[in-house]
Design a protein with these regions (language model features):
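Short, solvent-exposed amphipathic alpha-helical segments in soluble enzyme
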Residues: 51-52, 82, 207-213, 339-341, ...
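C-terminal lobe/tail of nucleotide-utilizing enzymes
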Residues: 180, 184-323, 496-505, 511-602
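Hydrophobic "anchor" residues on beta-strands that sit immediately upstream
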Residues: 35, 126, 221, 352, ...
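P-loop NTPase motor core
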Residues: 42-106, 359-420, 424
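Walker A/P-loop NTP-binding active-site region of P-loop NTPases
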Residues: 6-68, 122, 131, 141-145, ...
Length: 602
């Protein structure tokens, strides 16, 4: 019987590295191991330094790895579902069904369906799942229950679901029911929660455990990653950071008295099977060793753009300006968004908001932030798109519109049933996103997004949604849905045009100077270009000052940064690069955010 390990945690805490480390370590003990990334922006290929795709590929003895590609998986799922229908439907009806399958709902269910396939695979002794950051991990791990309930409920009603007739997917329901049982079985499944000893990461770890316990999952192991070496002094920037970490390490250990591992920060990044294996020995065998880099000494990087160029990108040129920050999890998007918003509030009324399910704006600003805008500073408000509130508001809006447009009671009941689909959440969040950006009250919008893969998904939704509405319009004027098609289509068209217009929207990537965040940022930039959006600049975070690097550890980290800063110049050839200096304390509270904002913009 296969064993399963899930890795979860805030973006950027090192989930992928620790998942890879665990998989390499266990395979070295003789276990036939499969490592799977369910993260839309997964970077297993970067870590193993080879191509990793949907089909499992062998990377070392007893170890194969795979990356779930949502596009390929969705296409395969659609073909599988449509094949039996093509024999019984006419050409027009089949075209309509195909269009239904082009929605975001299909992407989620197809990816999830593939995930549950792994939970029934006994080819391996151990399957390790490297998941997306916490909010999306929780989404993935609660979906088996949600889909199981939804299909059961639909079978008792219309017999239809948003992904086809119940009769066609009844087998899937049984598979999802089995997935729930496997994930709740402590003898088969364990969740490794990865945390950094920092405020937002610790909060996220405790939240994840609480939410997972609600789903019947209780078997956890804690990894405290990125622990700075103890220099025995508080001098130097890393010495001060190490002191800051101690209280958080104690807090984590008090809440996880057993099954806890501490992983020291290394001088170099972790890439390649040999380094991953060494980190496994350091983590699980307490081996005293260091992973070192071979970067040569170089002159300090001098190619950062001035603050005046940053302000030119951000200041509005018309009635309002949308500033969207995106990048890999853990690169500092939230702190950067708060710092940018503080500055723009000097220029006009500013709304700072997030679409990240694991929203951290409130923790950074030390202010309670919810789905209603709250003032956090002069001219600055903050709001969090709350998933539950968004879904409920969206459902009520659709049902009220249906009643106003003369739907029969039978049609309204069918519509209400369809709105129970777990897919409703994605489009509801997009609705809130669009409504906020269409509010003329604000001079500036600053959007702190979820990590890259989910940001790209959000930004693709307007384009998909518009295509679906166009299809509805072609079905004819007799449908009540068509009554609002023109208005909705215009609204979406306007939003698409605003996001593409560099006079109205500024997209900036956030990264720090290491291989994975730089290359993930580059991939995100290319994906944005695919939908007609051009990133206009790159924030490079946690930049070390050479004079702060007084010991071997910090000197090696500085050399690593110089190497990748020069690489960033090559990767983002035409983009302005903006520096955010590493601070010796966490950026928590308005006062600290203002200090960092001053350093960025002066």
């Amino acid at each position: 019987m296969a064993q399963y390990i899930f890795f979860s945690g805030k973006g950027g805490v090192g989930k992928t590295t620790m998942a890879a480390t665990t998989a390499v370590y266990q395979s070295g003990k003789g276990k036939r191991t499969l490592l799977v990334s369910t993260d839309p922006a997964g970077n297993l290929g970067d870590i193993f330094e080879r191509e990793v795709g949907v089909e499992p590929v062998n990377v070392s003895t007893n170890l194969t790895v795979a990356q779930m590609d949502s596009d390929a998986i969705t296409e395969a799922y659609k073909n599988r579902m449509l094949e039996p229908l093509s024999a019984i439907l006419d050409e027009f009806a089949l075209a309509q069904v195909k269009e239904e399958f082009n929605g975001g709902c299909t992407v989620e269910i197809a990816t999830f369906d593939k995930f549950t396939d792994f939970l029934g695979d006994n080819t391996y002794d151990l399957i390790v799942f490297d998941t997306a950051p916490t909010g999306h991990t929780l989404r993935l791990m609660t979906l088996p229950n949600e889909w199981d309930k939804y299909i059961k409920k639909s079978s008792e009603g219309s017999g239809q679901t948003c992904i086809g007739p119940v009769s066609q997917i009844e087998g899937a329901r049984k598979k999802y029911e089995h997935a729930v049982q496997v994930m709740q079985d402590a003898s088969q499944t364990k969740v490794f929660l990865v945390s950094r000893p920092e405020k937002t990461s610790v909060y996220e770890t405790f939240r994840a455990r609480t939410e997972l316990e609600k789903t019947g999952i209780h078997n956890f192991h804690l990894i405290i990653n990125g622990v700075y070496p103890n220099h025995g002094t508080t001098s130097g920037i890393f010495g001060k950071l190490a002191e800051n970490q101690k209280a958080y390490i104690n807090e984590l250990r008090s809440k996880f008295p057993v099954d806890t591992s501490e992983v020291p920060m290394q001088q170099s990044e972790i890439k390649g099977v040999n380094n991953i294996a060494l980190l496994g020995d350091i983590t699980f065998e307490k081996k005293m060793a260091k992973i070192q880099n071979n970067f040569a000494q170089s002159k300090p990087f001098q190619e950062f753009a001035p603050a005046s160029a940053l302000m030119d990108l951000l200041v509005k040129k018309g009635n309002s300006r949308i500033v969207i920050l995106t990048g890999k999890g853990g690169v500092g998007k939230t702190v950067t968004a708060c710092s940018v918003a503080i500055k723009l509030a000097e220029k006009g009324k500013t709304l700072l908001f997030t679409t990240d399910p694991a929203a951290h704006i409130g923790q950074v600003l030390e202010t309670e932030v919810n789905h209603i805008p709250v003032q956090v500073n002069e001219n600055l408000w903050a709001v969090n798109i709350d998933q539950k509130e968004a879904v409920e508001e969206y459902r009520q809006k659709i049902l009220n519109d249906a009643k106003a447009n003369g739907y029969t009671a039978e049609l309204i009941a069918a519509l209400a049933e369809e709105l129970e689909s777990p897919c409703t959440e994605e489009i509801a969040i997009f609705e809130q996103f669009a409504n906020l950006l269409n509010n003329p009250e604000w001079d500036y919008f600053v959007l702190d997004t979820a990590p890259t893969g989910h940001t790209l998904r959000l930004l693709e939704l307007p384009f998909e949604y518009k295509n679906q509405i166009d299809m509805k319009a072609k079905e004819g004027a007799n449908t009540a849905v068509n009554a609002n098609t023109g208005l909705v289509n215009t609204k979406i068209e306007n939003l698409i045009n605003r996001l593409k217009n560099t006079d109205e929207a500024a997209f900036l990537l956030v990264a720090y100077p290491e291989f994975t965040p730089l290359h993930e940022g580059f991939r995100a930039m290319k994906d944005l270009e695919r939908v007609g959006i051009n990133a206009q600049g790159v924030f490079l975070n946690n930049i070390l000052d050479e004079k702060d690097c007084t010991d071997d550890f910090s000197k090696e980290r500085w050399k690593l940064q110089q190497h990748y800063l020069n690489q960033a110049k090559e990767i983002y050839r035409s983009k302005a690069l903006f520096a955010i200096p590493l601070q010796s304390s966490e950026i928590i509270g308005i006062k600290q955010v203002k200090v960092l904002s001053g350093l960025i913009f002066n």
